[in-house]
């Protein structure tokens, strides 16, 4: 197990070195605790008083663990149209060995298409990827 402070310091260094304007990370609303720790480390590493860099922070939707929480659910507020990239997304997910099962599993090909269509319906496009904007400095 890696100490939380070590994770945070590594992220701080990468943010300072790379100077990103957007960081996409996990969400705190997850059953996968590694994802929650990742989100918290990014949150700490990019706190406004620490960093000269003020990147926008988005949390991505994980097709499974973000849907299986009992108390809270992932609520997106940013959508990216992916109609031109849906085939590439499916191909990329197919390389994620051991994480795909038959539908109705969310990470099956049919599950991923269903989620993309649902997020598309929410945002008025054919297919969309959903995110949660946690911080943006304009």
Language-model regions: role of each:
Residues 1-138:
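Metal-dependent de-N-acetylase/amidase catalytic core
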